[in-house]
A protein has these predicted regions:
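N-terminal membrane insertion elements
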Residues: 1-32, 241
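Residue-level recognition of hydrophobic positions within alpha-helical transmembrane segments
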Residues: 2, 31, 45, 182-185
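Ser/Thr-centric signal marking residues that sit
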Residues: 9, 42, 192
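Amphipathic alpha-helical coiled-coil "transmission" helices that mediate dimerization
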Residues: 19, 24-54, 58, 62-65
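Metal-dependent catalytic cores of enzymes that make or break cyclic nucleotides
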Residues: 57, 61-258
Length: 258
């Protein structure tokens, strides 16, 4: 009998039957305990992986001149956008957790370019535009869904809907959805946070600029979803200002608060 570890024959004996039942219950309990241990170890490995992602994101920010809450904000922006697009809950969570690594390729860009106070010149922009491919190389190719989505975001978040982006000049639907989502999230973050060569603008000001680039830089469907959650984006921005206090206790994989 497939899967059988014991069986009872007739005529039935009460003591033997009781012993066999007890044996089967013990086996069931052992199996459940083993399953619980496997689940616990899986959760521990998952948390370790998230901690490594957060640590790498922090290292990237240190190199750019100090820790901010940018990757936390962007993670929540991605969560909000994914939900507004109607993606499944697990997919939204996956993309949000993968988001901190989207700019990891900047670790391969010369430090004097990353920390330059003035606008970059053409030669420096050429170096800066290498960071999506560098990021994809750093993350590598994995079967793991989280790292796979992180690689896609890192590689494609500077592609443009009209095909004039970089590094591959992908156009329209050829750009993976995670990259299209991150393009909007990253643009909003860049416009509403303090930059070395420009001051931040308001959430509504950023929304107007993003809407103006719908169909050019950004996927119109994602822009439409973004416009529905601009208020929530602004709440995230206000809630996670760039303050050093408590930054090490932040959960970069937490779902966006509404």
């Amino acid at each position: 009998m497939a899967g059988a570890v014991d069986y009872i024959t007739k005529p039935l004996s009460a003591p033997i039957t009781l012993l066999r039942v007890r044996t089967q219950l013990a086996l069931v309990n052992q199996r459940r305990a083993l399953e619980d241990q496997i689940h616990e170890r899986t959760e521990e490995l998952h948390e370790t992986r998230l901690q490594l992602i957060r640590g790498l994101a922090r290292a990237m920010e240190y190199r750019e001149g100090g820790i901010t809450q940018r990757v936390l904000r962007v993670s929540e922006y991605v969560q909000l956008l994914s939900e507004a697009l109607g993606l499944k809950g697990k997919v939204c969570e996956l993309l949000s957790r993968a988001a901190p690594l989207y700019g990891v390729g900047k670790m391969g860009v010369p430090e004097h370019i990353l920390t330059k106070a003035e606008a970059l010149n053409d030669r420096e922009w050429t170096e800066m535009r290498k960071h999506p491919e560098i990021g994809a190389q750093i993350i590598g190719e994995h079967k793991d869904p989280l790292l796979g989505q992180a690689r896609i975001m890192a590689l494609t978040h500077h592609e443009r809907w009209d095909g004039t982006g970089y590094p591959a000049k992908l156009k329209g639907e050829a750009i993976p959805v995670p990259g299209r989502i991150m393009a909007v999230a990253d643009a909003f973050e860049a416009m509403t946070s303090t930059q070395r060569h420009r001051s931040p603008i308001s959430a509504m000001g950023a929304a107007k600029k993003i809407a103006a680039d719908s169909g050019k830089q950004f996927d119109p469907k994602i822009v439409s979803a973004f416009m529905k959650v601009v208020k929530q984006f602004d709440e995230v921005r206000a809630r996670h200002k760039d303050e050093l206090e408590g930054i090490h206790d932040l959960d970069f994989g937490a779902p966006a608060k509404k």
